[in-house]
């Protein structure tokens, strides 16, 4: 994501040491280089995109952000600790000469734990963090110290840049205010206790930023609360204080480079570093409304040129691109994705903000993996260094020595974690468990300790608590995996480790992994050696690490034996398609934005829709900040909009630039641009020029094989743009080819087909207008029916392989041209499916030619239809509203799972092979095929457990532990015959989901609930194999049965059955908008008949 940080993270370690030695200045004066570090030594990703990986080669769903947050907390040291650097050894040598005499391991652990407790004094309350004042002035504390992180990898430690941690906050159990001196910590310690430094401006006054939207440009103050990973901002006002007799005439308070302030209100003006300091401008809050989101809500971030599509859409000058930040996040109150476009005042502020976000993300991932490290893994030198770096300051703010007299300083040093500390850790890590359960574990550890050697700690000021060894016991009990233990017991049969042959049997016979080309067992041996323990075999932890790794991904991939998968003609594929791609909300009053194109392309969409209209000649171009082009007219400039509705237009040129930029990042296969032309001939000329200028040689403007009468394959059109546009030439000179298709002769006549259009029906097939216009919402601005503009030849001729023609009849010669494409509304195709004769013709047509189906214009809220009936009849492009994550879109994304197909799915052979001619025209070939060739598929699914499930979506229950249960649904089958088991079916929620069963409710445990519920039976299906599995995680207000309370869906996963591998698998879940929940997963066992895979493998 943050590609621009790569070079900043490459600063050498010597420079890092110099920065750390000169770290006494204020955070606001820090050098930008001090704000960046890379915990792994590798450059960060190009996008902070919290979705599943789109690349098959890079897909590692659980390896990077593991729900098993305690995987690194071990009781025994299993690896040799890294050795300190020469400089560290020198520091240790000098410090050890003045250290105390106690060097035993037990006292060492206690003292380290004491230091950690003093460090961990951050609050979870953002208001509390701002209320802390210093002793001498009453102003917010701005003095914060630097923790120098020694970055470690798997092989050797590396020195990293200093990172800024938030100011010291009040501890919930003490009135004492602790000050920290500069220390050195290994990053595992700092991160495991949740510490990170950020510039103090984010926790004190807030960073001034310029917020850009379609409606306005406003100044805001931006805060970050690192204790709970929260971002917040408020609108700001400016006040000016004169500090000298000479007052600067400069009034611009905009980011550097902005000279045109006509688009900004007076409240948006503050000073910048470039302005003379004779007048001091300060920001104040204009209202009490606070906008906020947390780190986990962020879906993607675009910085600088990555966000050029948004910047151009908002008419912001390119000179401000270097300070541009776009944050896409989920707004819980509005239950939708929101875009936050920001411009920093200068380069330094930009680096501060980006660094803070990146470091918080790294910390969040680290906390989710580790929670707290095992100090036994620290080498002795690091232990001594920690002991001799005193964390506790005296009353005068100076360090008195290695040991501080608590009675003199009136500071109370704790060597334990209270139960309140445990709750704070749980809240920070989103451990969604009943408080009573945590209390029981807490008391259990205390009881075990009192029965052995140690007694519970108790002081007059603090309640009883756990020392470090006891806390490790607490974590061990909390993370205990009974489900994994049962699997291990069944495999090991009493053994402590498993050897190679046993692991090979597990991988091949239980996990059903296909290693047919691994004759020498080299692949399996590589996996075995990677997770071997010290006993030269696999233990229980080895097994879990393998199940969580990329070697155990739950989804199948195209194997090397399927190298010809993309070599078939385009008409033999299902193609991932979007309807009204430019919309981010409803059809009537939603926003139009390039964001719609960016998001769909990032998810693998291969056919996007662009509705092109004339720009309004009565208005001028929106003022571009930083330019002087205020008087340029927008007449005849093509715009993208949803007709004459309340949606906002966007520039066609900006749309094409954004499409080109993101077109082939996720998928290399051809992208179809479906153009809907509603503009004048003059504007169409500009459309042609824009397409050619921006797309260049990547756009298909001539057949790649002029003699071919079949469509080319995706492999032949790799990285190419295909234009789909209406054909203007009449079909009067068609030549029939040998295979029955028709092609046009070289001589063409130019005529134009005119159609009518209304605001409710703006797509290709206008036959829906009659039925749609009568049901138009009163919210739409009505206009006279005008004839659609004529499509000029220059534009029509760009439709090389996807010529849009109006459907009249399947038997006409124009319906047999190899490169035509029918576009039908859902009402039209539904009528065809109900007619037996038309259904046969529909199936026959779609075996050889292209068709696109789109939702009705009466779906004012951009809802979706069920795409399964249209796929079952071979429709290649079933366009859905991607901005609405309902069942239709869930099925659409499940079919085109990016990790596997990247937007192109080869249709089942039964939908590609030519149909046999029947002696009777009344025979329904599909009905006959379904009756004689149905399949019975045995299945056995076991939902074993869940991990870090989301919290209640309602504010009324947000602080309560959830009562989760999971529904299991089979979609697309003719029938399902369930085996008898303890789970009872519940009534279907929709007509497309007739077969649902549920697990039992687990009381107040969303952290690691064990469901242990099996679902087995037989699926009766046709040979098209369009069978899908849907998991929905619910949070219930009832403790026993769903019918007794409210049930809130909190996570969803829909996948095609034969995409799933068998065996034990971790499956990541999506939120209600289809975005992956990075830390939430379910652990399941999958079994079904191998016969179902034959169609998938042997296509």
From Swiss-Prot:
Q: What is its EC number?
A: 3.1.4.11
Q: What is the lineage of its organism?
A: Eukaryota, Fungi, Dikarya, Ascomycota, Saccharomycotina
Q: Which organism is it from?
A: Candida albicans (Yeast)
Query: Domain PI-PLC Y-box: where?
Result: 794-912
Q: Which SUPFAM superfamilies match?
A: C2 domain (Calcium/lipid-binding domain, CaLB), EF-hand, PLC-like phosphodiesterases
Residues involved in substrate binding: 724, 726, 823, 852
Ranges of biased composition (kind: Low complexity): 43-66, 86-109, 142-155, 743-778
Example of a GO MF term = phosphatidylinositol-4,5-bisphosphate phospholipase C activity
Q: For this chain's UniProt record, which GO biological process terms are given?
A: lipid catabolic process; phosphatidylinositol-mediated signaling; release of sequestered calcium ion into cytosol
Q: Which SMART domains match?
A: C2 (SM00239), PLCXc (SM00148), PLCYc (SM00149)
**Occurrences of domain PI-PLC X-box (ranges):** 566-726
| Name of the encoding gene | PLC1
What region holds the C2 domain?
Answer: 917-1071
Q: Where is this region: Disordered?
A: 1-109, 128-164, 742-780
Record-given protein name? 1-phosphatidylinositol 4,5-bisphosphate phosphodiesterase 1
- The answer on whether this UniProt entry bears the keyword Hydrolase reads yes
List UniProt keywords, sorted A-Z: Hydrolase, Lipid degradation, Lipid metabolism, Transducer
* Comp. bias intervals (Polar residues): 131-141
Q: Where is the composition biased (Basic and acidic residues)?
A: 1-10
Reactions it catalyzes: a 1,2-diacyl-sn-glycero-3-phospho-(1D-myo-inositol-4,5-bisphosphate) + H2O = 1D-myo-inositol 1,4,5-trisphosphate + a 1,2-diacyl-sn-glycerol + H(+)
- PROSITE patterns per UniProt: C2 (PS50004), PIPLC_X_DOMAIN (PS50007), PIPLC_Y_DOMAIN (PS50008)
Q: What class of enzyme is it?
A: hydrolase
Give the protein's biological function. The production of the second messenger molecules diacylglycerol (DAG) and inositol 1,4,5-trisphosphate (IP3) is mediated by activated phosphatidylinositol-specific phospholipase C enzymes.
Active-site residues, as the UniProt record annotates them: 579, 642
């Amino acid at each position: 994501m943050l590609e621009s940080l790569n070079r900043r993270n490459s600063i050498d370690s010597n420079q890092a040491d110099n920065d750390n030695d000169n770290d006494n200045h204020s955070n606001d004066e820090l050098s930008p280089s001090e704000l960046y570090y890379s915990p792994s030594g590798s450059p960060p990703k190009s996008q902070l995109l919290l979705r599943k990986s789109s690349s098959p080669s890079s897909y590692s769903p659980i390896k990077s952000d593991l729900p098993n947050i305690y995987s690194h907390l071990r009781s025994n040291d299993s690896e040799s600790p890294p050795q300190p650097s020469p400089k560290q050894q020198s520091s240790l040598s000098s410090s050890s000469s003045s250290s105390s005499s106690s060097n035993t391991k037990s006292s060492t652990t206690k003292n380290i734990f004491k230091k950690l407790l003093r460090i961990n004094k951050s609050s979870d309350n953002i208001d509390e963090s701002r209320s802390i004042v210093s002793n001498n002035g009453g102003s917010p504390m701005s003095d914060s110290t630097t923790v120098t992180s020694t970055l470690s990898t798997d092989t050797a430690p590396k020195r990293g840049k200093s990172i800024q941690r938030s100011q010291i906050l009040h501890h919930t159990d003490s009135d004492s205010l602790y000050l920290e001196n500069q220390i050195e910590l290994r990053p595992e310690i700092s991160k495991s206790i949740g510490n990170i430094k950020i510039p103090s401006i984010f926790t004190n006054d807030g960073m001034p930023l310029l917020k850009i939207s379609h409606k306005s440009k406003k100044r805001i103050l931006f805060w970050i609360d690192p204790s709970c990973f929260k971002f917040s901002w408020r609108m700001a006002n400016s006040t000016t204080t004169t500090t000298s007799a000479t007052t600067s005439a400069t009034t611009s308070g905009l980011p550097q480079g902005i000279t045109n302030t006509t688009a900004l209100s007076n409240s948006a003006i503050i000073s910048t570093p470039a302005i003379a300091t004779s007048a001091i401008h300060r920001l104040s809050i204009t209202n009490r409304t606070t906008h906020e989101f947390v780190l986990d809500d962020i879906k993607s971030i675009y910085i600088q040129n990555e966000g050029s599509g948004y910047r151009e859409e908002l008419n912001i000058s390119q000179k401000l691109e270097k300070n541009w930040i776009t944050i896409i996040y989920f707004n819980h109150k509005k239950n939708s994705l929101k875009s936050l476009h920001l411009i920093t005042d200068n380069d330094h502020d930009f680096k501060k903000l980006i660094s803070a976000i990146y470091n918080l993300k790294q910390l969040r991932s680290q906390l989710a993996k580790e929670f707290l490290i095992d100090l036994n893994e620290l080498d002795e030198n690091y232990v001594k260094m920690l002991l001799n770096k005193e964390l506790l300051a005296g009353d005068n703010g100076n360090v008195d020595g290695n040991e501080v007299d608590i009675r003199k300083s009136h500071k109370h040093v704790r060597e334990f974690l209270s139960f309140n500390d445990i709750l704070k850790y749980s809240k920070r890590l989103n451990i969604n468990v009943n408080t009573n359960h945590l209390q029981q574990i807490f008391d259990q550890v205390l009881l075990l300790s009192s029965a052995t050697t140690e007694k519970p700690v108790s002081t007059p000021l603090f309640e009883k608590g756990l020392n470090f060894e006891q806390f490790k016991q607490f974590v061990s009990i909390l993370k205990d995996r009974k489900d994994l233990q049962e699997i291990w017991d069944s495999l090991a049969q009493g053994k402590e480790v498993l050897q190679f042959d046993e692991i090979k049997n597990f991988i091949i016979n239980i996990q059903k992994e296909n290693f047919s080309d691994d004759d020498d067992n080299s692949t399996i041996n590589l996996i075995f050696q990677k997770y071997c323990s010290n006993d030269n075999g696999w233990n229980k932890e080895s097994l879990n690490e393998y199940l969580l790794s990329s070697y155990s991904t739950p989804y199948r991939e195209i194997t090397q034996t399927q190298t010809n998968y993309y070599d078939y003609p385009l008409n033999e594929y299902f193609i991932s398609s979007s309807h009204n791609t430019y919309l981010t909300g409803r059809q009537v009053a939603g926003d139009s934005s390039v964001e719609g194109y960016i998001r769909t392309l990032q998810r693998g969409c291969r056919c996007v829709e662009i509705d092109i209209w004339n720009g309004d000649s009565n208005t001028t171009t929106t003022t571009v900040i930083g330019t002087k082009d205020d008087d340029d007219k927008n007449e005849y400039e093509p715009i993208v909009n949803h007709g004459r509705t309340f949606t906002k237009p966007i520039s066609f040129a900006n749309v094409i630039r954004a499409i080109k930029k993101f077109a082939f990042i996720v998928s290399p296969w051809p992208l179809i641009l479906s153009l809907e032309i509603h503009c004048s001939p003059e504007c169409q000329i500009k459309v042609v020029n824009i397409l050619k200028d921006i797309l260049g040689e990547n756009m298909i403007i001539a057949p790649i094989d002029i003699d071919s009468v079949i469509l080319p394959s995706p492999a032949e059109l790799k990285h190419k743009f295909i234009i789909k546009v209406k054909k203007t030439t009449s079909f009067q000179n068609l030549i029939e080819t040998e295979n029955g298709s028709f092609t046009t002769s070289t001589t063409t006549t130019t005529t134009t087909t005119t159609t009518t259009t209304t605001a409710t029906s703006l797509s290709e097939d206008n036959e829906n207008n009659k039925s749609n216009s009568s049901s138009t919402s009163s919210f739409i601005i009505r206009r006279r029916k005008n004839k659609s503009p004529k499509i000029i030849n220059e534009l029509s001729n760009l439709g090389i392989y996807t010529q849009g023609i109006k459907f009249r009849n399947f038997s006409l010669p124009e319906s047999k041209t190899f490169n035509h494409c029918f576009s039908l509304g859902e009402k039209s195709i539904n009528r065809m499916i109900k007619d037996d004769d038309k259904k046969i013709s529909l199936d026959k047509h779609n075996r050889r030619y292209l068709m696109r189906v789109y939702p009705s214009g009466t779906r004012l809220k951009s809802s979706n239809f069920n795409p399964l009936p249209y796929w079952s009849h071979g429709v290649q492009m079933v366009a859905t509203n991607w901005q609405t994550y309902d069942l239709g879109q869930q099925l659409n994304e499940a079919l085109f799972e990016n990790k596997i197909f990247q937007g192109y799915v080869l249709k089942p052979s039964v939908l590609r092979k030519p149909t046999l001619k029947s002696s009777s025209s009344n025979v329904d070939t599909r009905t006959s095929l379904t009756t004689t060739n149905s399949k019975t598929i045995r299945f056995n699914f076991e939902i074993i457990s869940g991990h870090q499930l989301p919290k209640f979506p309602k504010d009324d229950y947000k602080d309560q532990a959830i009562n989760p249960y999971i529904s299991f649904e089979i979609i697309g089958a003719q029938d399902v015959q369930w085996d008898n088991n303890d789970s009872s079916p519940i009534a279907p929620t929709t007509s497309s989901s007739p077969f649902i069963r549920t697990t039992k409710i687990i009381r107040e445990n969303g952290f690691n609930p064990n469901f242990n519920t099996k679902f087995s039976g037989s699926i009766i299906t046709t040979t098209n194999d369009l069978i899908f599995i849907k998991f929905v995680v619910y949070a219930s207000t009832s403790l026993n049965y769903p019918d007794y309370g409210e049930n809130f869906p909190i996570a969803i996963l829909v996948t095609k059955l034969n995409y799933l591998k068998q065996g034990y698998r971790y499956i990541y879940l999506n939120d209600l908008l289809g975005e992956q929940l990075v830390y939430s997963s379910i652990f399941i066992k999958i079994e079904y008949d191998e016969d179902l895979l034959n169609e998938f493998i042997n296509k």
